[in-house]
Each structure stands twice: as structure tokens, then as C-alpha cells.
Amino acid sequence: MEKLDESKFEQRLQLWALRIPRELSSAVTRLLRSGYLLDKPRVKTVVEDPEGDKNRLVILSEKIQKPDLSDMPQQELDSLKQLCNVDVVPYTLTLGYSYWSAGHVAHLNISDDLLPYKNVIAKVIYDKNYPRIQTVANKVGTITNEFRVPKFEILAGKNDMVTEVKQYGATFKLDYGLVYWNSRLDHEHIRLVSLFKKGDVICDMFAGIGPFAIPAAQKGCVVYANDLNPDSVHYLRTNAKINKVDDYIFAYNMDARVFMQNLMTVPGLETGSDCQVAADESYPKEGVPANENSSSNGNHNDVREGSQNGANESSVASTTAKKRQQTSEECESDCQDGDASQTKRRNNKRVRGPGPPPSKPWEHFDHVLMNLPASALQFLDCFDGLVQKKYWTGSLPWIHCYCFIRSSESEESILSNKLNAKIAEPIFHRVRDVAPNKAMFCLSFKLPMECLREDDSENHIESVA
């Protein structure tokens, strides 16, 4: 048997920590426990200071990105300075081989040469980690289904893939056999959400069970979240309710192109037969607030209801837009001042405020998330002519598109002919290596002005149909 290289499982997080007198550890953690401390299972937030015994290091959350602590509200910062002199130091956290699991499920990806020993490997993992680990599953084959969900073989323990994962102050319920989840991407989720501001409107085209949508809603953003997988949308709604942000998340279950077209349909705008958007009739056409038709332990059919209503695509888009407008009018009160994420407590209190601010996405949205690295680039062309210039207000949105880039490919080749417009100053953030010659990146850029259309012509939609 080849020796297991445990270093391949390591992930290093570059964080910030506060060096404080050890006698103030409890006071500081009480002050920062409302979302500003590192929140990872089995990881201590207060650790020894390698430079001396008189001090301790308090590890800060991933969302604290700046050493001057300007990410933190001034009130908390002032209270902290009253306690002691603030000494901010860099801190590297290494999450090693023994850390990775999803709730009670240990997910393995055993290489071909070790497959003869798979049962032995699984039994050792199960025996040494029970009861924390109650199911050991191995990924089987390559992902080929349309929902990008891997197949698993249960090697040890009970056949129960429904579990809960806690990350950055949020709880995610999922069925590992029905939806996609990667515990190693939590740092990337926080990195991107840290770019959002309270009140921002977010369009999540491939939302999954909510790894971006939930923390964005906790921050006070309005999130239009879509996924093609009905099971993912079921757990997205469930997780929105668990984390008490269901008033901020509107869940859709449809093709991503149709999702964006529906959001950008202006209420009352007449559409001709040439601009009808083709959609798969097996999916409902209307976005539903996450607090409707949802149950954390209910039947998954809740996301499939309405798929047989027989309405044509153009009337559906108009109905959806009118429903959004009605919802916006019911929420005219502005959110209370202060970051909504401050109100998130470990007992999972509902985000404070009267609900999300009015949102008309055909007039303005701030960020679009495209977290489907295997094929998201193919959807960039849906932004060509999507936004009507005469209705748009404010600055153009940021697009965040995840993709894989091989060592033989260049960033220029990735961008060519994807949007039918020149992308100015694209930002490529390297997320992680997925193979020796392949890495996952997040491409971020402002939507070019050339992508806006000048009039009500919908000829561009032919490419979406």
C-alpha cells in the first residue's frame, strides 16, 4: 500500500488575531461573539501566544479582512479599545487531514490503487471517530448528471446522508446524496460575501443549498437565489428558515438563463412572440420567498408545484415580475441601521429589521454569482442585452464567475468571445488547486456598458431560448 500523504488534505487560512492580556480573554470574546470570532467546529478561538505566557491570541472571523479592523462596526471597535490596547497580528490556521467532514458524514475520494483496501480504510476512520463520524462514504466514478451531484458508496456506518454542517455562524442542512456540498470552500464563501454591503441586491444563478445566499442574507442583502436541482432548492429554503433569513431570500427552481430573464422583465412590458423564453416545463417558473411552501422535514415536492400550470413563458415572466413588485411594495420600510450580520447570535436569532428593502432587480442589482465552475463561463453571454438602459439606475453590477483554468490556458483565452464585449480590468482570484495542472478561479468584473440595450427590443433573447 502506498503511504497516505495527509498534507494533500491541508488548507491554510490567512486570518487576523488580537493579542490581548490573558486575563481579558473572557471579556474580549463576549464582546466579539456576535459574529466577529472565528466560527469553525472543533477549532478554539482563544489560543496560546507563541511569544509569551502573559498574552493570548483571539482568532478573528474570516470576514475581518483588514488589519485596521475597519470591517468591524465602530461601536464594537471603541468598546474593544476601552478594554485594552489593540494589537492585531497575522494568524495562519491549518486545517489538516483529520478535520474534513460534513456533519456526521466522512466523504472519501479513494484513488484506484487503494480501492482494494477501501473497507479497511473506512473501518479505521469509523472506529477512530465514532460517534462524531457515523457514516463513511466513498465517491464513485465521475460526476455526469445534470445536477453535478456525485454518487456515493456507503463503506461503514449507517446509510444516512442527511446531515447538518455549521459554518461562519450558519447552519446548513443537506442530503449529501442529493445535493452538492464542499466543506473546503467556506473560506471562499466568506471572502466573496465580505465584498457585499447591507441592502445590496444579489442574484445567485447557481445557488445550491445556500453557501453564498445564507451569509449574504445574514448580512442584510436581498438575495434572488436559483438552482436547477429541485432538491437543492428544497434545502435552500429549509436553510433560510433554519437561519431565520427567509424574508431576505427568494428561491427559484429553473434554468439559470430563464431565471435572469425573469428577474429583468419589467412589469407591464408587452412582449412579442419572438421574445418568448423557452423553459423546461418540469420546473416552476415563479420565484417563491423562502418562507413560503417550505418545511424543514417536508416532502421535496414543494419546489416542483406549479410546473403543470401550462402558462406560456412570456406571461409567466410578467407574472413573476408583478409578484416581485408587489412584494417590494409590502416592504417599503428601510432596514435598521447597522450591519445585519451583527444581529446574528449563536442561538440563531432572526435578522433584525422590518424585512428586506424594496427591490426591483430590473432597475438595479449589485452582484451576480455564478458558482458552477465546470460550465459557468458558457452562461456569460446571457448578460449581452439583458439590462435595459432606460430602466437601469446606479452603477453597473459586479459579475463573479467561477471557472476552471488549466496550466495550458491563459486568462486571455478564457475571456475571449464569452460576453461579446471587452471586459475591462478583470480580476482573477485563485481559489484552490483541483489537479496538478488545473485550478479553480473566481473571475470578477464590472458588467461592460456595451452589454446594456438602448430600447425595448428583445431580439437578443433569441440566443437565450
Curated annotation (Swiss-Prot):
GO terms of biological process kind: tRNA N1-guanine methylation
Catalytic activity: guanosine(37) in tRNA + S-adenosyl-L-methionine = N(1)-methylguanosine(37) in tRNA + S-adenosyl-L-homocysteine + H(+)
EC code: 2.1.1.228
Keyword tRNA processing: yes
Bias type Basic residues, positions: 343-352
Cellular-component GO terms for this entry: cytoplasm; mitochondrial matrix; nucleus
Major localisation: mitochondrion
Localization: Mitochondrion matrix; Nucleus; Cytoplasm
Protein keywords: Cytoplasm, Methyltransferase, Mitochondrion, Nucleus, S-adenosyl-L-methionine, Transferase, tRNA processing
Enzyme class: transferase
Alphabetized GO MF terms: tRNA (guanine(37)-N1)-methyltransferase activity; tRNA methyltransferase activity
Residues involved in S-adenosyl-L-methionine binding: 189, 227-228, 255-256, 371
Disordered as annotated region, ranges: 283-362
Keyword Ubl conjugation: no
Ranges of biased composition (kind: Polar residues): 291-320
UniProt record similarity statement: Belongs to the class I-like SAM-binding methyltransferase superfamily. TRM5/TYW2 family.
HAMAP family: TRM5
PANTHER family, sorted: TRNA (GUANINE(37)-N1)-METHYLTRANSFERASE, TRNA METHYLTRANSFERASE
Entry function: Specifically methylates the N1 position of guanosine-37 in various cytoplasmic and mitochondrial tRNAs. Methylation is not dependent on the nature of the nucleoside 5' of the target nucleoside. This is the first step in the biosynthesis of wybutosine (yW), a modified base adjacent to the anticodon of tRNAs and required for accurate decoding.
Quaternary structure note: Monomer.
Protein name (record): tRNA (guanine(37)-N(1))-methyltransferase
Taxonomic source organism: Sorghum bicolor
